[in-house]
Amino acid sequence: MEHGSIITQARREDALVLTKQGLVSKSSPKKPRGRNIFKALFCCFRAQHVGQSSSSTELAAYKEEANTIAKSDLLQCLQYQFYQIPGTCLLPEVTEEDQGRICVVIDLDETLVHSSFKPINNADFIVPIEIEGTTHQVYVLKRPYVDEFLRRMGELFECVLFTASLAKYADPVTDLLDRCGVFRARLFRESCVFHQGCYVKDLSRLGRDLRKTLILDNSPASYIFHPENAVPVQSWFDDMADTELLNLIPIFEELSGAEDVYTSLGQLRAP
């Protein structure tokens, strides 16, 4: 197993550069998408009402596209219904302490820390990982203000770590990072959905009300199923002058009292 398959990271050259105004996505706010059979059927039937002027090739392509969308929506509908059955969700039931709180899914790599198999002089942690019988050292840098950020998040939300990296790396790193026990649960790569070459964090599988669920992640691909629930964050590698997490604290303080995150995020996204 290669080193790169252990840790899922953003590449420095692909990092999404966000302005302060862009900390919250500019996509339009929406209520939870009604993934129901009627919507899926509508997509199927829509292709039958294309104008007669369309060429047979265009019509065939349109039908194929509509049918693909319908199947995708129907599948996600069935998946959503399945994960509403007790015992099938990724997360345990909400504790009494977290009743009424918003659930915030928080990414690890390039959001809270940056890790490397190459030696780093000022590493905050050095974590040994065994790969195919050989022990390798992983050097971990903490993002500036991560301790303050996690402490405040733990006071306000039900916090869940969700990473596309493997548990054999992410679990010991989180043990060192989260000394105060902010994360109520930890989810790793096996809990992701592999979709079009990317590991996606499907929030509908958590077992939480999507109107009371947020995700903080540096990779838009991670929340492609639920962009309306996302608070984007700029990828971090080694800039010790970075203040992104510090700047996010007042944003999350405002969101913590939301009855519906779609409405509150929409207000934050408004120009």
Swiss-Prot record:
| UniProt-annotated binding residues for Mg(2+) | 107, 109, 218
**One Pfam family from the record:** NIF
**What CDD domains does the database record attribute to this sequence?**
HAD_FCP1-like
In Gene Ontology terms, what is one molecular function of this protein?
RNA polymerase II CTD heptapeptide repeat phosphatase activity
What does the record give as cofactor?
A: Mg(2+)
Which cellular components does GO assign to this protein?
Answer: nucleoplasm
E.C. number(s) listed in UniProt: 3.1.3.16
Q: What is its main location?
A: nucleus
Listed A to Z, the keywords are:
Hydrolase, Magnesium, Metal-binding, Nucleus, Phosphoprotein, Protein phosphatase
Q: What does this protein do?
A: Preferentially catalyzes the dephosphorylation of 'Ser-5' within the tandem 7 residue repeats in the C-terminal domain (CTD) of the largest RNA polymerase II subunit POLR2A. Negatively regulates RNA polymerase II transcription, possibly by controlling the transition from initiation/capping to processive transcript elongation. Recruited by REST to neuronal genes that contain RE-1 elements, leading to neuronal gene silencing in non-neuronal cells. May contribute to the development of sarcomas.
Q: How does it assemble?
A: Monomer. Interacts with REST.
State the protein's name.
Carboxy-terminal domain RNA polymerase II polypeptide A small phosphatase 2
Q: Which gene encodes it?
A: CTDSP2
